[in-house]
Amino acid sequence: MENNAPRRVDRRTAYTKNTVKDAMLELLAEMPFEKITVAALCRRADIVRTTFYLHYDSLTDVIKELADDAVLAASGTGSKNIKDLSILAREMNKSTDPELLAPYMSLLPVCQRVADDPKYKVMFRDTMVSDYILMQIYRSQKSDSIRQFQDHLGISGQQAEKLFLFVITGAFEVNKSMGWEKKQDWYEVQKVLLTFISGGYEKLEQYFAK
């Protein structure tokens, strides 16, 4: 009889991989990714090279898995509805006080919230590593976002894909330029950007509804 029960997670494997990923985050806080070596990572994780290569083919694989983890953590909370950006824009036009806006921060898309987790923040300060995160956000959010753009705006799949690419890369680069810190000037900038984006959505809806 075939056993269709899910396979039990190998705890030793999970522990080892988490140890390697934590060691990578520690090293990223000390040096650029391009200067990190397998030997240095193994020393920090207290494992031998054979163990490392049992789980990963390269250092890049560790980064990609960390990027997956960061995006997954951000995707588990908050809104996925593009309409909610209009709500946030309205609130920001009332006030840019961080305390007053705190209840609405979950309305931000993943590309805006992904660096909020202190555990992964160090990854965003390395240009090479942050590019992997952007690619992972794009891959993980692409299908759902394109569908929403098509449903709400009545545009083609190609138009929806390019609009999503424009929004996500723009938001990501603005956050990168501001050091991924949500200080007062970040709220002022976001007020302008979200008002611009939500206004564009509304105009597109009106245009294609004709």
Where are these regions (language model features)?
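Alpha-helical bundle regulatory/interaction domains
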Residues: M1-E30, K35-A40, R44, V48-K210
